[in-house]
């Protein structure tokens, strides 16, 4: 897998990332965990080291699933990104609470990157 080096940050990420918004699903809409785990494992085996998920993906099930699967890997072997749901935040305390929840769901501290998601107006920021 080709990597991109970010000298100032001292990191090297794969040119391809693995997005966790659309995992295979069961007929009832839940994540098909065996199939999804195989996909994530295969991406990591191929050298992908940037994993991207978000608070609302798969009705909130993506972060906990990704956190569970990634437990078997050395935390220093991948970069994990998630997104803070700005539509659910009205105060600094809300942001802190939701971010703490995300760390719990992902079973990690820290995440590598946090993006602000779905900010449609300046008021969301």
Residue ranges and their predicted role:
Residues 21, 54-56, 83-87, 116:
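Active-site beta-loop-alpha junctions enriched in small/polar residues
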Residues 31-42, 91-105:
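Short, acidic/polar
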Residues 50, 110-113:
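Residues at the N-termini of beta-strands
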Residues 1-78:
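N-terminal binding-site loop/beta-alpha segment at the start of enzyme catalytic domains
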Residues 46, 106-109:
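A structural motif corresponding to the C-terminal end of an alpha-helix
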Residues 114-123:
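Conserved small/polar residues in nucleotide/adenosyl-binding loops
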Residues 65-69, 83, 94-101:
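Generic beta-strand or strand-like secondary-structure segments
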